[in-house]
Amino acid sequence: GGGMMVLNPETLSLKYFAQGGDGDAELFQKGHIFCVRPDEKENLWIGTSQGLFCYNRQAKQIKHFTSANSQLPEGNVYEVSFDSTGKGWIATETGMCIYDPASQSLRSNVFPEGFVHRDKVRTIYEDTGHNLYFIREKGSLFTSTLTMDRFRNRSVFSTLPDNSLMSIVEDNQGWLWVACNDGLLRIKEEGEEYDAFTFNDGVPGPTFTNGAAYKDEKGILWFGNTKGLI
């Protein structure tokens, strides 16, 4: 890994993140950093190969969650996603947990039977209807309400290979765009049918990059593809 660097937007200079403890210096210079996400209090959450870090930028303090001092499942922390209620969804190599902002703790014992908390989840996304979508390393698209009282596998993707889903984003018209390793799909949240976009539609390459989908302030969608940015 190459650690984590901080960009100064005024000078365009880069420097290594150096706010961790003495034992964390090597991680932030040479270790594996998988994701960096802000919460509603402007803390930065950093998923790494050595656990989960929460950095308070105002106080310049950092907290380190591991499987030894919390209910964080073991392994690499691949995804951190905060929903519209402020709750944090944490996905690791071996499963999931939830960050409860009220108790400021991680909890892995809150999931109902049949949920995806034991799978390797790589992407978690909330749409404007407050539905959550989980993209696993293997398996179909999984969707749930914020309270986990209703959840299911999306049967529309049952014909796709298990490892084909890469990223997801919603456009301003309510369509969900799902990037795969064999093209780009567009679906309606309530529908079970989809439109497929391939080379004939201007997609430069069939394979999209894991987790690389973004909607900007103008509503334009951006996707990472092995042939470049589209």
Where are these regions (language model features)?
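Carboxylate-rich, polar loop motifs that coordinate divalent cations or form catalytic acidic clusters
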Residues: 1-230
